[in-house]
Amino acid sequence: MPITLQFGMTFGGRGGSIADDAVRLENLGFDSIWAGEHIIWRHPMHDGLMTLAVASSVTKRVLLGTSILLMPLKHPILVAKAVVTLDHASNGRAILGVGVGGEYPKEFIAMGVKREERGPRTNEAMQIMKRLWTENNVTFKGRFWNLEDVSIEPKPVQKPCPPLFVGGRRGSIPRTALYGDGWIPYMYTPEMYRDGVKQIEEIAHKAGRDPSKIQRTLYAFTSVADSFEEAAGWSAAALGTNYAQDFTQLVKKYPIVGTPKQCAERMQQFVEAGVRHFILAPSGPADKTKGFAEIYAKEIIPTLRKWNA
């Protein structure tokens, strides 16, 4: 039976290249464009929603998602309002991907948020935003936020609301099952993904939710070269710098690296584990990663579509 797959890519550029990158990715045929964010990080990063706002002004078709927005560091009313604005600006193409963060404690210290509260804060925020998008006169009594008779207008273009995806690792599983419209794990193997899908289905069923309505996405760092060793080396160096740890062995386990054929074969393993939407994050030297989009568009994605037709 044919499998419908979607392919997205994260922004690889900085500064003035945002608009150019968005146009290029849409013209190459990608289904979605994604922007991550860190308020404070080891290298320069733009605000995710502002980046997507720029992209919305120069594209017409691609979905525009955050991968991910650090929800515990934001007020849910402000995020809900910003996402509605993006949804209108893009004529209904916005996706809000949220996560709890925590891998860079300086962000939480600077924002005055306790790291141990990041999960419960995100759970409350997700509930609040969905209600603000779909209801008027919202009253909510929580541990972190209290709303009394609050409405935001206009409502989103998408009905009932923009998809709310959950990023992360193990902690993202129950959050997705209970509150999410989609799952975006990262640093996962096919085996981990298959097990995660099973857990989401079980938790969603118990909560009275239909797990078939939860979109199955994967955020995957990727590096493409003439050999596995070269691609793995590029990715290990880049990820090691970003996450301040040794990725020499981890790069063989989590990212999608290798020749175009090897990348396609690894992605097919994820398809068989349940992935239906790939978010590809180029990982490697800046002068090499810019070409990854073309390689995916011309070689890897057509191969996967053929295998799953």
For every predicted segment, state its role.
Residues P2-G13, L73-T139, Y186-M187, E191-K198:
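Flexible, glycine-rich active-site loops centered on histidine and acidic residues
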Residues M1-V58, L63-L64, K159-P162, S283-A286:
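N-terminal beta1-alpha1-beta2 module of alpha/beta enzyme domains
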